[in-house]
Amino acid sequence: MSGHRKRVYPQSQFQYANSVPAAGQAAAPGYPPVAGMPQADYSQQAQPQAQPAFLTPAQQQLHQQIDQAVQGVGNMQLHNVPVVDPNGFYQQQPPVTTPGAVPSGAVPQMQQQYAQPAAIGKAMNQLYPIDLLTELPPPISDLSLPPPPLMVPPEKFVVPSETANAPPDFLRCTLNALPKSNSLLKKSKLPLALVIRPYQCLSDSQNPIPLTSDGXXVRCRRCRSYINPFVTFVEGGRRWRCNFCNLANDVPMAFDMSTQGVPTNRYERNEVQHSVVEYLAPREYAVRAPPPSVYSFILDVSQNAIKNGLLATAARTLLETLDTLPNHDDRTRISILAVDNSIHYFSIPTDEEGDHIKMLDVVDLDEPFLPMPDSLFVSLSECRSNLEKLLSQLPEIFQYNIMNKFALGPALKAAHNLIKRIGGKIIVVSSTLPNIGVGKLSKRNEAGVANTSKEASQLLSVQDSFYKNFTIDCNKTQVTIDLFLASDDYMDVASLSNLARYTSGQTHFYPGWSAAKLTDVTKFTKEFSKHLSMDLSMEAVMRARGSSGLRMSRFYGHFFNRSSDLCAFPTFPRDQSYVFEVNLDEQIVRDYAYLQVAVLLSSNTAQRRIRVITICIPTTESLPEVYASADQLAITAYFAQKAIEKVFSSGFEDAREFLNKSVQDILATYKKDIVVSNTAGGAPLRLCANLRMFPLLMHSLTKHMAFRNGIVPSDHRAAALNNLESMPLPYLIKNIYATVYSLHDMPDEAGLQNENGEVVLPEPINATSSLLERYGLYLIDNASELFLWIGGDAVNELTMDVFGTPEILQIPIGKNELPVLENSEFNARVRNIISKIREHSDIITYQSLYIVMGASLSEPVNHASAREVATLRLWATSTLVEDKVL
């Protein structure tokens, strides 16, 4: 490979996006100086940032207009920040605090009294106005920027540290400066909501957070918030004042003692140093001992599942995953139900009792019973050999099955009866529409209804109330349902997905799946295996709290809303995200507000744990400061949830109209209340720099499969809506606005490992077909699939280096893997990039690769794969959301 001569492929003669200034080149001013504890001096005021030495004519005109506006309306305090380069807006700013060493036993003297006002002129994010019409093409590098920083001075922390405010990966607010009044919030037209992801990895052993294991979970006796880095100790440290409700609470003696009774320094405790902490919960937080991990598998053994190979693939994958199934304490239990027009139980003895496995058939679907309850639900450790034997023989047992019925409803009730005393997961693997017994479904007539005002009500509604009512029973008994649906026929994802939605589960949809396709098998086995290996936490509840004036009002995600503010999770997933809408019920009088999320659950290590996440957010009476601190990605996530809600309540047209109107309202408010003068000689479209990608994201959302106009199969539409409901924020943004890499002209280091052993990815380009050269090679990543686009006029050298064939018409299009070419370094680099993109430790998704050939003038009109090529092109180009195609 080292002797391979590097090829130079054709490249564009004009760099389309090079003229766009990089976002975030200068840190925003306004930070107080950082000093060590406890002699910190926070009185120094922020200094104005110097003007840039060179300005473009547009920037000079913009500066003159803003200067005139500031002079003319200075008393109105509309612009109370220094003017800087509008293209130098917020970037990852240096922390406002640095870790300070606290002498052992010493009490920091830098805390203010709870109600003491902040210093006049506190540092806030600054408003950097831009003209959207001059920001073309949109600077997509902004999508990878962090949100505007939380401007919290060190004196607000018990112990200043970089971890004293929760990182945005766990908890981020749509507004990082909260309006003090509801009238100001309404005036802004910006939403106030939280995007929550309490767990960042599929396994708790990856990137663990600080754990407090002494059993002392200190909480406010009035509002029940947990002690956190923003409380104050008063009365000589004997009491602590709650930052949520202002109540002074006694500090328990155990707070200053180790588990061995040795005095310790309270300022070294995790809960006052970190805003993301976990507790080993004391006994009063559990109504029973933590249950074991429980899995009940419902396997479709009907004719469809035999023919397409799903049963054999699922059984083999489960067999290979037994070693990685969570079983830390050897208490994990398993049951297997095979289902067609009957329910087939398997009585599995322990390995010591022998290897005779009995299959017990129950044909009464109206009243399914448990023939031998004690041996149908067995220990993984004690029955390991017999479980392996059963899974190996399962495809053979049903290989000649000709039944085309699938009794999912009765099977769900049977599995629920098996595990309801303990709780756990019911995992359904099916390729057949439930067509017998309770919950029977039928194929809907999509002709004449798709792409009409009746589409949502007739194609996406639940056919049978069983799929909602049954979830109530599951929540009472701590049972989650996960679905793996793989078929080339209609599955009614809209009805079935309710089972997962209201039990904190997930629906995984594999349209057109067949075990005859290696790529289909690879995707299913990798995702099914990762799902089974994910840590299982049971009996979970999550609650969010706000300081005075803040209240959680609406909740979005996969869970069961048990009360006005308590979300219940029979099992807590590691690969989902949630959105909570926040109401401003009363005037906020303080300079800082607080939000806290707590998750209580039973881990699969037989421990009851509490994860607490707290953030401190400055408050303001200034509309420009509210806009300057708006988080465009979190706002997009919120509007996506509201649009999904709108689909089910009033249809797709109203959902698209809602998204468009939301953007129009924000632009109109900014123009009316923040832009202070008109611009001569043009009609600029003004917005602040930290929101400049927001209109594009919302426009892209209207083109998403979940919302776009046109005929979309209802199963695909329902699956897209289901994914948007629960997708973690980074993947949600990528699913809305795909990442496009240009590979034929990528830098020399791209596709190779850097000094840290990480594969270097090329810089993304804008998602528009105007940038796709007819001779180029591009990779499109939308978080669900990967598209490798080869231009129709690509030179033979490029196709030879990538695919091993000089003829472009011989390239294997469709769902395929890139061939391994031993003598092509370029092929290895492209494969490295694909592998890097597929690496995920926080979600189970494995992205299939689709090879797409672009149009060419020399392309035969009626070649054999013309229809498939056209379909693939349309699908791939639908991700290029900057085009006016859809």
Swiss-Prot record:
Domain of life per record: Eukaryota
GO cellular component, one term: endoplasmic reticulum exit site
Region described as Disordered: 31-51
GO molecular function: SNARE binding; zinc ion binding
Subcellular location: Cytoplasm; Cytoplasmic vesicle, COPII-coated vesicle membrane; Endoplasmic reticulum membrane; Golgi apparatus membrane
InterPro entries cross-referenced by the UniProt entry: ADF-H/Gelsolin-like_dom_sf (IPR029006), Gelsolin-like_dom (IPR007123), Gelsolin-like_dom_sf (IPR036180), Sec23/24_helical_dom (IPR006900), Sec23/24_helical_dom_sf (IPR036175), Sec23/24_trunk_dom (IPR006896), Sec23_24_beta_S (IPR012990), SEC23_SEC24_subfamily (IPR050550)
Keyword Metal-binding attributed: yes
Membrane topology: Peripheral membrane protein
Keywords of this entry: Cytoplasm, Cytoplasmic vesicle, Endoplasmic reticulum, ER-Golgi transport, Golgi apparatus, Membrane, Metal-binding, Protein transport, Transport, Zinc
GO biological process: COPII-coated vesicle cargo loading; intracellular protein transport
Residues bound to Zn(2+): 220, 223, 242, 245
Annotated region described as Zinc finger-like, given as residue ranges: 220-245
Purpose of the protein: Component of the coat protein complex II (COPII) which promotes the formation of transport vesicles from the endoplasmic reticulum (ER). The coat has two main functions, the physical deformation of the endoplasmic reticulum membrane into vesicles and the selection of cargo molecules.
Assembly and binders: The COPII coat is composed of at least 5 proteins: the SEC23/24 complex, the SEC13/31 complex, and the protein SAR1. Golgi apparatus membrane; Peripheral membrane protein; Cytoplasmic side.
Protein name: Protein transport protein SEC24
Source organism (scientific name): Lachancea kluyveri (strain ATCC 58438 / CBS 3082 / BCRC 21498 / NBRC 1685 / JCM 7257 / NCYC 543 / NRRL Y-12651) (Yeast)
Gene label: SEC24
